[in-house]
């Protein structure tokens, strides 16, 4: 099978060009998505957390996709100030999400995030699509809007040898029920720290095998329309931590009211906005 190429674009690529590539190929890498200071800050803030995390699946539904030498700790908005105050504010994330979800769904919010850490000796992850967590994906047609999108960002180099993520460009256009792509159709996303792989829910992908002597580490942030319940709740975050965030991130994490495409309010307090009822402030304004 002839697979389209995986596109690598610079940070200053016009968003219209990025959306065109996503429509045609289903995925791409944005170079220097994060600056090196942000990369290092995230690494410093999560390193002890990751090192003390036991590898392997934590839930039954993870058994097929989380290997015995994979660490995927979540709760990053609590563990990393850089993640909650800078990464989740990223202009590229919101430019893409607004165009992907806005016209059909209206507002979107944060679904969940985790570290993507592979120890040496980890095997190849089964090839999968992220939208299988949504039962309605069984009825989704290739021309329908995606149900979710994931931004996978590199904290270390991603190579073929250390288990960098592989994708099958063009597979987002396959009909439902299509078999996963063959191994020879998977294309490695070769990334430097700070690069980001954009993965809509319909894109077939998987982590590679880590045949190197070093760990491979990245982290993710996924978003979906506000019609859907997020994997992660953030109502355990201290109030002072929430008020350090921008109003946009507060909305992403469920502390503000959202609007559907027809301006119907959801996640509201009575007939008013949740943020008004709780007296929420943002010192980031």
UniProtKB/Swiss-Prot annotation:
Signal peptide: none annotated. GO terms for biological process: terpenoid biosynthetic process. GO terms for molecular function: dioxygenase activity; metal ion binding. The keyword Oxidoreductase applies. It is an enzyme of class 1 (oxidoreductase). Pathway: Secondary metabolite biosynthesis; terpenoid biosynthesis. Its EC number is 1.14.11.-. Disruption phenotype: Impairs the synthesis of anditomin but accumulates andilesin A. Fe cation binds at residues 128, 130, 205. Its cofactor is Fe cation. Keywords: Dioxygenase, Iron, Metal-binding, Oxidoreductase. The keyword Oxidoreductase applies. Disulfide bonds: none annotated. Belongs to the PhyH family. Homodimer. Dioxygenase; part of the gene cluster that mediates the biosynthesis of anditomin, a fungal meroterpenoid. The first step of the pathway is the synthesis of 3,5-dimethylorsellinic acid (DMOA) by the polyketide synthase andM. DMOA is then converted to the phthalide compound 5,7-dihydroxy-4,6-dimethylphthalide (DHDMP) by the cytochrome P450 monooxygenase andK, which is further prenylated by the prenyltransferase andD to yield farnesyl-DHDMP. Further epoxidation by the FAD-dependent monooxygenase andE leads to epoxyfarnesyl-DHDMP. This is Dioxygenase andF. It comes from Emericella variicolor.
């Amino acid at each position: 099978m002839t697979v389209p190429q995986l596109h690598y674009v610079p940070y200053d690529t016009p968003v219209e060009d990025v959306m065109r590539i996503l429509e045609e190929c289903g995925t791409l890498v944005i170079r220097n998505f994060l600056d090196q200071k942000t990369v290092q800050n995230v690494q410093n803030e999560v390193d002890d957390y990751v090192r003390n995390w036991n590898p392997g699946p934590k839930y039954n539904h993870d058994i097929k996709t989380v290997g015995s030498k994979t660490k995927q700790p979540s709760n990053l908005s609590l563990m990393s100030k850089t993640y909650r105050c800078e990464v989740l504010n990223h202009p590229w994330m919101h430019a893409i999400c607004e165009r992907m979800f806005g016209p059909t769904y209206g507002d979107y919010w944060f679904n969940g995030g985790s570290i993507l850490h592979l120890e040496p000796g980890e095997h190849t992850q089964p090839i999968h699509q992220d939208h299988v967590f949504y039962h309605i994906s069984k009825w989704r047609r290739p021309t329908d809007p995606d149900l979710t999108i994931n931004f996978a960002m590199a904290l270390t180099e991603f190579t073929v040898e250390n288990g960098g993520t592989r994708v099958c460009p063009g597979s987002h256009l396959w009909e439902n029920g299509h078999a996963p792509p063959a191994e020879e159709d998977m294309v490695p996303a070769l990334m430097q720290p700070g690069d980001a792989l954009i993965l809509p829910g319909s894109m077939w992908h998987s982590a590679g095998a880590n045949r190197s002597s070093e760990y491979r580490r990245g982290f993710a942030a996924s978003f979906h329309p506000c019609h859907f319940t997020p994997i992660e709740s953030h109502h355990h975050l201290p109030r002072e931590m929430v008020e350090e965030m921008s109003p946009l991130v507060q909305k992403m994490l469920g502390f503000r009211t959202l609007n559907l495409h027809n301006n119907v309010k959801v996640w509201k307090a009575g007939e008013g906005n949740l943020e008004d009822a709780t007296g929420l402030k943002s010192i980031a304004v």
